[in-house]
Design a protein with these regions (language model features):
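Residue-level detection of the helix-turn-helix DNA-binding "recognition helix"
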Residues: 16, 30, 41, 71
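Short, charged recognition helix plus adjacent turn
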Residues: 13, 38, 67-80
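A short, Lys/Arg-rich alpha-helix, primarily the initiator
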Residues: 1-21
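Short alpha-helical DNA-recognition segment
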Residues: 19-38
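Short, basic-rich loop-to-helix N-cap that marks the start of a DNA-contacting helix
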Residues: 43-54
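Intrinsically disordered, low-complexity basic tails/linkers immediately adjacent to helix-turn-helix/homeobox/MYB/SANT
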Residues: 57-65
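The alpha-helix within a helix-turn-helix
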Residues: 15, 26, 56
Length: 80
């Protein structure tokens, strides 16, 4: 798994945990529906830091919490 796949999986996981749809996330985060859709559908494989920060804010987590998972730690080891 690469960073892009991790990001998509993490957004989907957090939406499921909060019982919100990607469309609801776009509204809460102040990000367009097309931006969320393009990230989740693979059209945008490199969401910017500002976009990711808005998504995290909408999910009521920090960016540290977004990346603080076992999957990310494994990914980090693979990259090194």
């Amino acid at each position: 798994m690469g960073i892009y796949e991790y990001t998509v999986n993490r957004i989907n996981q957090l939406c499921e945990e909060r019982k919100i749809t990607p469309n609801a996330l776009s509204y809460i985060a102040g990000v367009s529906q097309s931006t969320i859709k393009s990230i989740l559908n693979g059209e945008s494989k490199n969401p910017g830091v500002v976009t990711l920060k808005k998504i995290c804010d909408g999910l009521d987590i920090t960016m540290m919490e977004f990346f603080d998972t076992e999957e990310y730690r494994k990914l980090e080891q693979e990259i090194q």
